């Protein structure tokens, strides 16, 4: 409908969020909601907790929390970080969630994590599941091509991070 939503300013990065916004606009228009009200809602929406949530943004460091627990979500979060900080070094800290998910998607997790500059994996969080022999965070780590990768116990993570020059 013409120039509807020209120059809309969004607070959420990433192609996946743009697709979500496009769908929300389409539904709003179909429901007869005015452009003003749709724009106001979208421009004020800050996202949800633990989905590309900026925890800290300083001159030299940025901390973003994202509870991506599926390879496609993880890839989308990494691509969003790259779009926000294209020339910055991005370190990802990933804790696999569930033995079955790790087993079923290990290759896809490894491929997504390879998009980072450096990765630290911590121990798998089993939630409600019993351990599956041979499945751990190392299952993903061993499939990764990335050279800058490590496994660190969660209890040692802060000390390990203090030794690094962090960026994103």
Where are these regions (language model features)?
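Short, intrinsically disordered, charge-balanced linker/junction segments flanking boundaries
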Residues: 1-4, 161-168
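Nucleotide phosphate-binding/pyrophosphate-handling subdomain across enzymes
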Residues: 2-118, 142
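C-terminal helical cap/extension that packs against the catalytic core
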Residues: 110-165
